[in-house]
Amino acid sequence: MYKRQIPDHTLFGEYPEKIPESEIKPTGESGEIVLSRVVIPEYVVVHDGAPTDSTARDYYVRYRDYIKNVACSEIYATWPDTAIRANILAIMSFTLNRVYTEWYRNKGYDFTITSSTAYDHKWIYGRNIFDSISLVVDEIFADYLSRPNVKQPILTQYCDGNRVSCPNWMSQWGSKNLADQGYSTIQILRNYYGDNMYINTAEEISGIPSSWPGYDLTIG
């Protein structure tokens, strides 16, 4: 019987390092189209490869299931609760920045986000999901990270913090160590991203949001 081989977890597998990006994207200056408000999509379209890999498959994935998959691929379910929450918030805010700015659609692609760690987060088709992560996502899935007077969710980047160092980004192992010391979720996030980082909440909509003509944003 054929058995699917699940790729390695990012904390011990060999994956490309994240290519640094600005955490706040310029909008409206060179024709980019963005959503009118921050929303939580019902679905995202995941391109299972690098953006330019035309052979990679696109998957329609429920937003919550996507976040659960990424979190289970990026961190360990045995970590302290505040570290799990901090990492999930960073994953969600990064993802919602891609949604809000229509980052890939503005580049001519028909997907929301990729599974390449060089560009986005690790998403593994068909992987197992851990309860401790699943429960947190179900509780806080409408949240994202914001800064004062910035409309878009912050593109909160991170790295493992052991094999790779990333100043001004969150260290995944470092977040676990801070949680072990009793840091709260927001204290962990502010330790890495600065004191003007806040947790915000958006409304959930049905379907896949788009600013292009022919689509309506409906509240789910």
List PLM regions with ranges.
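Conserved, single-site charged/polar hotspot
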Residues: K3-G220
